[in-house]
Amino acid sequence: MIVRPQQHWIRLIFVWHGSVLSKIFSRLLLNFLLSIAVIIMLPWYTMLGIKFTLAPFSILGVAIAIFLGFRNNACYARYVEARHLWGQLMIASRSILREVKTTLPDERGIEDFVRLQIAFAHCLRMTLRRQPQTQVLGNYLDQEALQKVVASHSPANRILLLMGEWLAIRRRSGKLSDILFHSLNNRLNDMSSVLAGCERIANTPVPFAYTLILHRTVYLFCIMLPFALVVDLHYMTPFISVLISYTFIALDALAEELEDPFGTENNDLPLDAICNAIEIDLLQMNDERDIPAKRIPDKRYQLT
């Protein structure tokens, strides 16, 4: 995620870090070079009687803009839902620890429960990003639990099971009543709902055929555009063609980033920072001293 302070509109025009321009610059450069080639070839294909008009491109451009808008809205909805789910995880994590602390004030094993909660957040993050988990989870789980979690089809779900077992042991020993156990178990169900929601987004991409047809149409439009502009604009063709192409190609590239909100692109969710915030909150609630520093954006304003 890009976290920038409010800037003057003139400075925003020239922003590089955080924009998709760095990703699509080579494509715009190709469009610029193609436009120059079209200017050079103009006398030849005029002699052949080949003539393009802007009318079909105007109609096609409006259609592409509408469908790009639909796709971007769908991808942004995935992004918003993903952020909402991680917000729910923060609420559930704080709530269940608060209830455990107040119902079991003399419990000495709460540190283990806190580490299970932190491990769950990091495990979910690394699962969604398809990253190796053993090294990070080893900081929060004992060797036996770590082996069970890593060997599971759904490691995060296995950690939820370990948290449920921790509560069940206190219930069997009489430290938790059935009512309190049921309340705490509902919090675990909330965390399970977050897990399922994130898995649904991660495992259900925008239909490939829909993405493909838009991608093809956008690039064919941008390739043919200089031929339609050159008759009227001539030497201004490269500049106008690049400007129009930037609008369409940038929207297409932005939709690709937002489609998977759990990745590490510039405009994806800052899962590292969210997990860091959860860890800090839980450790402070448990009055621990060894607390990690809060993550801040890097020099390029990116927060991962």
Swiss-Prot record:
Xref: Pfam families: Bestrophin
Ranges annotated as spanning the membrane: 28-48, 50-70, 209-229, 235-255
Keyword Ion transport attributed: yes
Domain of life where this protein originates: Bacteria
Gene Ontology terms for molecular function: chloride channel activity
Cell compartment(s), UniProt: Cell membrane
InterPro entries the UniProt entry points to: Bestrophin-like, YneE/VCCN1/2-like
Membrane topology field: Multi-pass membrane protein
Keyword Transmembrane helix assigned: yes
Entry keyword set: Cell membrane, Ion transport, Membrane, Transmembrane, Transmembrane helix, Transport
GO annotations of cellular component type: plasma membrane
Protein family per UniProt: Belongs to the anion channel-forming bestrophin (TC 1.A.46) family.
Protein name according to UniProt: Voltage-dependent anion channel-forming protein YneE
